[in-house]
Design a protein with these regions (language model features):
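Bacterial N-terminal signal peptides
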Residues: 8-17
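Signal peptide processing junction and immediate N-terminal pro/mature segment
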Residues: 17-28
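Serine-esterase "nucleophile elbow" of acetyl-processing enzymes
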Residues: 32-105, 122-128
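Cell-envelope and extracellular/periplasmic
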Residues: 33-40, 105-111, 133-143, 197
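Oxyanion-hole/transition-state-stabilizing segment in secreted/luminal serine hydrolases
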Residues: 53-54, 66-68, 73, 96-98, ...
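Structural recognition of the beta-strand scaffold that forms the well-ordered cores
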Residues: 64-69, 102-107, 130-136, 167-172, ...
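Active-site segments of SGNH/GDSL-like serine hydrolases
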Residues: 135-138, 158-189
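Catalytic His-Asp segment of secreted/periplasmic serine-dependent ester chemistry enzymes
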Residues: 175-259
C-alpha cells in the first residue's frame, strides 16, 4: 500500500525518473501567467526574508539557486517543463537582464529528511548556492516517520545549509486528493512550519497552494487521465509562484525588477 501511495504522489507531479539532460534542451521563455495559476496573495507572501538573495541582486552578482528534492521535482523527458526550470525562466524575465540566474536540481530520491540532511555538508562544499529550496516531507509521511524525529532532522538540515552560507526556503508536501486519506500529512506540515518560524526562513506552502487549485477547480488533481499534460501545467504554475515568492521574500525594489 505504501509503495502505491508513493507512486501515485510521484505520478501526480510528473516524475518517475529524472530526465536525461540533453544539449540544447533550453528553458522556454516565461509567457503570461494562465488564469489557472492564480492564487490569493497570502499564499505567496512571507514575513521571513532572503537577505543573501537580495544582496546578490543588488550587487549584480549571479543568483545561483539549488533545489533539493525528490523525483517529483522533475518531469520525465521534459526537464524544461519542470518547476525549477519554469522558476528560472520567470526569474530571468522579472529580474534585470544583466542578472545571471541559474537553477540546478539535486535529486534525493526516496530519502527521508534525515537521510537528505546528512548529505548537506558535502553537498554545500561542492556547491555554493545563494539560495537552497529544500522540498521535503512526502517520503517521511509515507513511511510514517515519527513527527518529532522529522522536525529534528529538518532543523539539522536547515542549520547545515545556513552554516554553509545559503538562504533557505522550505517547501512542504504536495497535495493529492487521491491520497489524503491514506497518509497523515498534517503533523509534517505543522512541524515544517515550526522549523521555518524558529529559523526565520520562508516556507513555500506547496500543499496549500495545490489544494487551493484543486478546490477552486483550476486543476483536477484527482483524475489521473491527463497525466503528463496536467503535470506540465502544475509545474508551470508552481515555477511561477516560486519565482514571485523568492522576489517578494527578498524584498526587491521595483527598480531591481523588470518593468
Amino acid at each position: 500500500m505504501k509503495a502505491k501511495v508513493l507512486l501515485s504522489l510521484i505520478l501526480l507531479c510528473g516524475g518517475l525518473a529524472a530526465p536525461v539532460a540533453r544539449a540544447g534542451d533550453a528553458t522556454p521563455a516565461a509567457s503570461p501567467a494562465p488564469a489557472a495559476c492564480e492564487l490569493p496573495s497570502y499564499l505567496l507572501t512571507s514575513e521571513s526574508q532572503l537577505p543573501k538573495v537580495a544582496d546578490a541582486v543588488k550587487a549584480g552578482k549571479p543568483l545561483d539557486i539549488l533545489v533539493v528534492g525528490s523525483r517529483s521535482t522533475t518531469i520525465p523527458s521534459s526537464e524544461s517543463s519542470s518547476y525549477p526550470a519554469r522558476m528560472e525562466a520567470n526569474l530571468k524575465e522579472k529580474l534585470p537582464a544583466s542578472e545571471a540566474v541559474h537553477v540546478s536540481v539535486e535529486i534525493q530520491s526516496k530519502k527521508t529528511a534525515e537521510e537528505t540532511a546528512s548529505t548537506f555538508v558535502k553537498l554545500m562544499e561542492a556547491k555554493t548556492p545563494t539560495l537552497v529550496i529544500w522540498q521535503t516531507g512526502t517520503v517521511d509521511a509515507i513511511r510514517s516517520i515519527d513527527p518529532d524525529e522529522f522536525r529534528s532532522a529538518v532543523t539539522d538540515g536547515v542549520a547545515a545549509l545556513q552554516k554553509a552560507g545559503a538562504d533557505v526556503v522550505l517547501m512542504n508536501l504536495q497535495y493529492s486528493p487521491r491520497t489524503e486519506t491514506m497518509i497523515s500529512a498534517q503533523p509534517f506540515l505543522d512541524n515544517m512550519r515550526v522549523v521555518a518560524q524558529e529559523h526565520d526562513i520562508p516556507l513555500f506552502d506547496r500543499f496549500a497552494i495545490m489544494r487551493q487549485w484543486n478546490d477552486q477547480g483550476q486543476f483536477d488533481l484527482f483524475s489521473p487521465s491527463r497525466g503528463p499534460e496536467l503535470a506540465k501545467q502544475v509545474h508551470d504554475c508552481l515555477g511561477r509562484a516560486l519565482a514571485q515568492f523568492v522576489i517578494d521574500a527578498a524584498h526587491l525594489e521595483p527598480a531591481q525588477q523588470q518593468n
